[in-house]
Every structure is written in structure tokens, then in C-alpha cells.
Amino acid sequence: PTMIFGDLCDHNISKFIRMFDKLPIMPEIDHGAGPIQPVNARDLGQAYYKAATHGSLPQLEYICWGERPVTVHELCALIGKYLGKKTRFVSFPMGFGVFLAKVLKAVTFGKKDYVEKMLRLGEDRSFSHEAASRDFGYVPDSFNEGLKREVEEYMKHGK
């Protein structure tokens, strides 16, 4: 999985939560249309346990993603809702975002390189976990509930 979440040390969704809490306006690329499918660390732990204790499995490699795909925009809107903040978005085209990332990289002599991160915002990062569900009963928890727990943890401990 490319985006694991579940606590304030995840370096993924926790960064979005902090940004949302600090910024009055949230920038997004191409209206936040890029699909992602974050997986909760708890779900991965259960998947590893189920796979390890299942006995023989028909394949050696499984994709274990979160419950469902969400767009980056939906993710950010949910974070705003759970933080109790009015959500304001400003959308930029992908090309402009990549241009700004390249300028930042140039003026910092390569110390700040966000070009790849910018490009990833437009990638489809959603995949099926059908084989894991079929072969060893992988059923991820609700994405919304997992996100809500992480925002509540932030509000309690992370500010």
C-alpha cells in the first residue's frame, strides 16, 4: 500500500490533518480528483495475522487496501468536517503545480523536492483487495470511521 494511516505518526493523512487545521484555504490539484485508497494500519495488522494463520494460500502476494477509493477532495472535505472547520479549496491545474514544485526545487538547490509528490496527486492509487477478501477473509474497517478516529486523536493529543 502507498498510503497507510491510523495514528499521528503515519506521515500521510496526519499531514493533511495538520495542514487543514493550520491553513484557512486548502490548495488542491485538478479539483482533488485523484483517487486514493488509504489503508488503516489496524486493517493491515489483521490482514497479516489472518494470512499468517490461515495455512496455505493460493498466492504469495496480496493487495490489502482500505475499504474504498476516495478522491483527495473527499478526503480533505471529511477532515474539515471532522475538525469542525469550514472547508475552502483553491484548485490549480497539475501542470501549474508541477511548475511551482520545480521552481521550489531550483531555488532551494534541490533541498525541497516536491515534484514527485505533486505528480502522485494525479495518479489513480486505488486497487481491488478482492483476492485477499476471498482467500483469507480480509475486510477493512470503514474509511470514514478510521479517519474520524485519527482526527479525534489529533484534536486530543496532536495540537
Regions picked out by a protein language model, each given a short descriptive name:
Residues I13, I25-A41, V103-S126:
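Low-complexity, charge- and small-residue-enriched intrinsically disordered regions
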Residues R18-V39, A47-A51, G55-S56, I63:
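A conserved pocket-lining segment of Rossmann-fold NAD(P)-dependent short-chain dehydrogenase/reductase
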Residues P1, W65-G66, E123:
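A secondary-structure boundary/capping signal
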Residues K50-D113, H129, D135-K159:
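Mid/C-terminal beta-alpha module of Rossmann-like enzyme folds, strongest
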Residues D7-D10, G32, Q37-G45, E61, ...:
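Conserved loop-to-helix N-cap of the C-terminal "lid" that shapes the substrate pocket in Rossmann-like
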Residues P1, H31, V90-F92:
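Conserved beta-strand termini and adjacent loop/short-helix elements that scaffold enzyme active sites
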Residues P1-D7:
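Conserved beta-loop-beta element that borders a ligand/cofactor-binding pocket
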